[in-house]
Amino acid sequence: MLFPPSLPPTASGRSLGRVETPPGLVRFMVGLAEAPKGGRVLEPACADGPFLRAFREAHGTGYRFVGVEIDPHALDLPPWAEGVVADFLLWEPGEAFDLILGNPPYGIVGEASKYPIHVLREVKGLYKKTLSTWKGKYNLYGAFIEKSVRLLREGGTLVFVVPATWLVLDDFSLLRSFLAREGRTEVYYLGEVFPGRKVSAVVLRFRKGGKGLALWDTRRDGETFTPLLWSEKPEWKGEIIRFETGWTREMEASGPPLGSLFHIRFAARSPEFKKHPAVQKEPEPGLVPVLTGRNLKPGWIDYESNHSGLWMPKERAKELRDFYATPHLVVAHTKGTKVVAAWDEKAYPWREEFHLLPKEGVELDPLFLVEWLNSDKIQEYVKTLYRDFVPHLTLRMLERIPALLPRKGNTERRKHGPYTSPESAGSF
């Protein structure tokens, strides 16, 4: 057994990714949980075992209860449960479980200056070697999901409450495929249920063996959650999970997805700009502001304000990204899931946002498309499908947005003049 790293005396619940679960949510999850009499029931990152206690109260005493906790000071289980001080992600119990339930820690493991879960950064390399779904800036809760699935018996059940980000983010693509291979996945959308936390949550109910996906909405009345089946996908292979409707399917059938028309690029990052010899921190003649998301407005770009604190010669911006030299479509990455688009006629340097370059042979009226992307219809489309799963529009979400093209025979085209104010944008 691998025991946890030596935790600093100042290790806190926050630095370990711990968040208290509201009692009503615990009861809802226990209602989704099941195990055979005499079965083994596990709560990872258990602290005082709220899920074990609630399950025993609801289902009785005929089970073997185990709790694993990395922080010995937080472990406080009742005498009828076995408590284990260990790093759950590296723990090897030698025996499988019939039910695993709880609220795993969430956060990214890394340096204290950037990431909340910094006390585990020394063992991050071991996590990556041990787990097959680790990808990108993997959130710790994804690692807990994979580890738990591996510890289940065939036919065993996992019930976790986790952030909704895994439904759509690329960092969790390996996890979604893993779940699809290993069993049947059910997702219960909750929204923001943790007091004081701007995190949209879902309950994941997974049964090892079987296949397919079921997506549930929930209706909340005080501390009571009522599930409402939204959709089922018997042949789910790990694709992103969305609240599809007949209307969203009609929308997507109405035009080609943006990803089929454009190469979608992301801006150069702040460190790249700061290392570039032509970038200055004070304005000088011949320099232009490096633009950020705050310069991007629906249908127009504020070329005058400087929110980055950086200036550079416009003609040298292409040294950071070649597309900076070409007028192109810019779509917000930093406006929540709201779609905000404008045509960058002046071809300025950007520190943020998505930059869309037409693929070879694609001819478009960019300003017609800008108007469509900023429309109420597109905002409703995105909100319907993705609700508040993630704080920002993602590449995969953007790629799927249908492009409305001008009707054939409509030869009237807008002039491609730069729009630098709300008034000029509204005139096209």
Swiss-Prot record:
Q: What is its EC number?
A: 2.1.1.72
Q: Where is the secretion signal located?
A: none
Q: What is this protein called?
A: Type II methyltransferase M.TthHB8I
- Catalysis: reaction(s): a 2'-deoxyadenosine in DNA + S-adenosyl-L-methionine = an N(6)-methyl-2'-deoxyadenosine in DNA + S-adenosyl-L-homocysteine + H(+)
Which enzyme type, at the first EC level? transferase
Statement: the UniProt record of this protein carries the keyword Methyltransferase: yes
- Annotated S-S bridges: none
Alphabetically list the UniProt keywords: DNA-binding, Methyltransferase, Restriction system, S-adenosyl-L-methionine, Transferase
GO MF, one annotated term: DNA binding
Tell me what organism the protein belongs to.
Thermus thermophilus (strain ATCC 27634 / DSM 579 / HB8)
Keyword 4Fe-4S on entry: no
A biological process (GO) annotation for this entry?
Answer: methylation
UniProt lists the family membership as follows: Belongs to the N(4)/N(6)-methyltransferase family.
Which stretches of sequence are listed as region Disordered?
407-428
